[in-house]
C-alpha cells in the first residue's frame, strides 16, 4: 500500500501511516459486523464488503494523497468483513450438509490466488502506478454484481443461525 500512496503523491511518512491503519480497520469492521449486522443475512455483509474497496479506490484516484487514510479504512473494512463472509455466506447459501468439503473447494483457489495477489499487484502498480486500482475496482464490482444475482433459499426453521 505505501507504494500505491506514493504514486498518488503522498509523502513517505504519510504513506506508511495510512497503510498502518489496515489492521485496525479490519478489526473494527469485524466488530461492527458482529454487533450491527449479526441478525442480517450474510449476503448483506458480502455486498457491503464488496463495495467498500471500489468506493475507497475511486476516492483515492479522484482526490489523491489526502484521502489515503480513508482508502485504507474502506479497503481494510471490506477485507475484514470478507473474512467473516467467506465462512458465513456458503453456510447460508448451501446449508450445513457437506459444509466442510464445500468450504475446502471454495477456499483452496481463494488461498492460492490470495497468496499470489500481493506480488502480482505490486508488478501492476510498478507498471501502471495508481491506475492499477482500476483492475481491483473492476474485480470487486464484478463480485458485487455476482452477489446481486445470487439466489438464496429461505432458511428452514431448524437451520442454525
Which ranges hold each PLM region?
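Helix-to-loop junctions at the C-terminal end of transmembrane segments
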Residues: 29-42, 125-126
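A late C-terminal transmembrane helix in Major Facilitator Superfamily
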Residues: 96-128
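Symmetry-related core transmembrane helices of the 12-TM Major Facilitator Superfamily/SLC fold
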Residues: 132-149
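Intracellular juxtamembrane helix-capping segments at the cytosolic ends
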Residues: 81-94
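Helix-loop junctions at membrane interfaces in 12-TM secondary transporters
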Residues: 62-71
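Short amphipathic helix-loop junctions that connect adjacent transmembrane helices
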Residues: 1-13
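Structural signature of the two symmetry-related core transmembrane helices
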Residues: 44-59
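Loop-to-transmembrane helix entry
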Residues: 10-24, 101-105
